[in-house]
């Protein structure tokens, strides 16, 4: 009934298996990839006809993590998987980016790739397994895909690169300082297609070495996919790239002069208007048949690309007049918004971000329910890209895939310089509002985020800056690497290469290639040119702010204290009675974790001190021989009980009240009376023994034995 094909190799410390022919047989391509005990099913389907008027390539990649894969039941009211999580969205983008450039140019049929996590061993991250499965499924599907590709994750510890580090190793690099890198690389046999990383100030050489290490590591996986395809791939789909050379020639003849003049305008808004006018001129010169040609958009783009790309490679001058390695003018401002905790306006040419930092407490941490466990994050970065930032009227709604991806890129860049939670016990939320955009808005978020956090008083290890690089690679092998690319250069170029870091090293790197890959030599030159740009931007940022500022009066203050874990119950009290009383009396917010770390938060320093003192009085142990002020809470025949140390009571025996014989303690004491007592010690049962007669009740000074009156 089944025509199964299964291939396996030893990859790293695990066995990687690809199998097809048993599940989802009606899909064009279906592969289950298994690494260790982590399994992902990838299914590929594609339309056999192009939709009329389709002028772009409609590739959609979905990645789903099923809770059953880790033996879990989803939370929430409905108890089922709902909209994609941030991890699922980011992984879908991770898979999409290296696949998209490898479809035959001109193919515009709809393609759907669905990756479903079926089993998770809590050791191997499913994202790389999903990428391998998707590539294998496309390779055997018959779709016009010029793959395969494969992906690998690389760590860096003690100067050694590590292939496929575990989920726990990569969970939070801030908590694992020995592990300095989380790098994902995807590529073909000959070239790297995509890079994504979070790093802890790695040098350019170390980062390039990691990319080369990953590219070498994926070669056996590529051979495995090819081996699978040789046994079971479907017949290639009958598709020939459309020949629209005559249409391209007509478009060029009709408007090359106008288009070239439009691209000579440096101002974005004026250039956009001029380009639109040039397109209208071209349309007016074309026949009705040419206007209806579905390849007209591609012909237009080809003309624009040839003008922009050719001028840069031949003359070294870009459309805004800059040299290839020149950064646009930068203006940095901080402290713009009076009621926020920290704010910055970062402007680089026609790209601008208003970035705001808010400091919160432990209650504000983000709770993340992942397949490999539940955890909290005390650093949040949200990126917003409204339509007005590019002068358009468009949809406004929840963040899309692009906004989530750009926000995560900026998060990775800044994560490496945050102080440890034990040193800075705040939840930090950074929001980047992109107010203008003409290329590299995610890197503006990195620069603005660094400025904003320093303005809020966050003690960063070092400022961080980011720059977006571009590449124009011509067919004859000539190329130009561009620093701080514009939107048009991104749109019409061959590479989007974003690098962020401190003066000491790289903290984040992301690379997307629109062609069949670049060589290590080009990547090395791009990294060196990016470093020069990054150092320049850091210098411009330093003119505005160089370190953490004083806290805003509107920001909460947080004091931390460590108590013995066996005292946690006493601080909380029965049903939370004690801690509620502390909060009500002091006015501060109090948070206790299972390790006995207490965070006391309030904008009011007096409230923090009050809560701190109340907690200290509960958990601290009274010292023998010390004098305390207490209150008589109960009188009995043999003495009086005095509350003297927070909630602690001790007995003053009748013989220790005064230096004379008393008939009854009530002769000199009454309930509610304030007295001074000395802690004599503890009896055999641990009960506290106190004395009043050795303390001057007015001054609180201890009475020396020779000063004490005789009985």
UniProtKB/Swiss-Prot annotation:
<dbReference type="GO" id="GO:0000175">
    <property type="term" value="F:3'-5'-RNA exonuclease activity"/>
</dbReference>
<dbReference type="Pfam" id="PF01138">
    <property type="entry name" value="RNase_PH"/>
</dbReference>
<dbReference type="Pfam" id="PF03725">
    <property type="entry name" value="RNase_PH_C"/>
</dbReference>
<dbReference type="InterPro" id="IPR027408">
    <property type="entry name" value="PNPase/RNase_PH_dom_sf"/>
</dbReference>
<dbReference type="InterPro" id="IPR012162">
    <property type="entry name" value="PNPase"/>
</dbReference>
<comment type="function">
    <text>Involved in mRNA degradation. Catalyzes the phosphorolysis of single-stranded polyribonucleotides processively in the 3'- to 5'-direction.</text>
</comment>
<dbReference type="Pfam" id="PF00013">
    <property type="entry name" value="KH_1"/>
</dbReference>
<protein>
    <recommendedName>
        <fullName>Polyribonucleotide nucleotidyltransferase</fullName>
        <ecNumber>2.7.7.8</ecNumber>
    </recommendedName>
</protein>
<feature type="binding site">
    <location>
        <position position="490"/>
    </location>
    <ligand>
        <name>Mg(2+)</name>
    </ligand>
</feature>
<keyword id="KW-0460">Magnesium</keyword>
<dbReference type="InterPro" id="IPR020568">
    <property type="entry name" value="Ribosomal_Su5_D2-typ_SF"/>
</dbReference>
<feature type="domain" description="S1 motif">
    <location>
        <begin position="625"/>
        <end position="693"/>
    </location>
</feature>
<dbReference type="Pfam" id="PF03726">
    <property type="entry name" value="PNPase"/>
</dbReference>
<dbReference type="GO" id="GO:0003723">
    <property type="term" value="F:RNA binding"/>
</dbReference>
<dbReference type="GO" id="GO:0006396">
    <property type="term" value="P:RNA processing"/>
</dbReference>
<dbReference type="InterPro" id="IPR001247">
    <property type="entry name" value="ExoRNase_PH_dom1"/>
</dbReference>
<keyword id="KW-0479">Metal-binding</keyword>
<dbReference type="InterPro" id="IPR004088">
    <property type="entry name" value="KH_dom_type_1"/>
</dbReference>
<dbReference type="InterPro" id="IPR015847">
    <property type="entry name" value="ExoRNase_PH_dom2"/>
</dbReference>
<dbReference type="GO" id="GO:0004654">
    <property type="term" value="F:polyribonucleotide nucleotidyltransferase activity"/>
</dbReference>
<dbReference type="GO" id="GO:0006402">
    <property type="term" value="P:mRNA catabolic process"/>
</dbReference>
<keyword id="KW-0808">Transferase</keyword>
<dbReference type="InterPro" id="IPR036345">
    <property type="entry name" value="ExoRNase_PH_dom2_sf"/>
</dbReference>
<feature type="domain" description="KH">
    <location>
        <begin position="556"/>
        <end position="615"/>
    </location>
</feature>
<dbReference type="InterPro" id="IPR004087">
    <property type="entry name" value="KH_dom"/>
</dbReference>
<dbReference type="Pfam" id="PF00575">
    <property type="entry name" value="S1"/>
</dbReference>
<dbReference type="InterPro" id="IPR015848">
    <property type="entry name" value="PNPase_PH_RNA-bd_bac/org-type"/>
</dbReference>
<dbReference type="InterPro" id="IPR036612">
    <property type="entry name" value="KH_dom_type_1_sf"/>
</dbReference>
<dbReference type="InterPro" id="IPR036456">
    <property type="entry name" value="PNPase_PH_RNA-bd_sf"/>
</dbReference>
<dbReference type="InterPro" id="IPR003029">
    <property type="entry name" value="S1_domain"/>
</dbReference>
<keyword id="KW-0963">Cytoplasm</keyword>
<keyword id="KW-0694">RNA-binding</keyword>
<dbReference type="GO" id="GO:0005829">
    <property type="term" value="C:cytosol"/>
</dbReference>
<keyword id="KW-0548">Nucleotidyltransferase</keyword>
<dbReference type="InterPro" id="IPR012340">
    <property type="entry name" value="NA-bd_OB-fold"/>
</dbReference>
<dbReference type="GO" id="GO:0000287">
    <property type="term" value="F:magnesium ion binding"/>
</dbReference>
<comment type="similarity">
    <text>Belongs to the polyribonucleotide nucleotidyltransferase family.</text>
</comment>
<feature type="binding site">
    <location>
        <position position="496"/>
    </location>
    <ligand>
        <name>Mg(2+)</name>
    </ligand>
</feature>
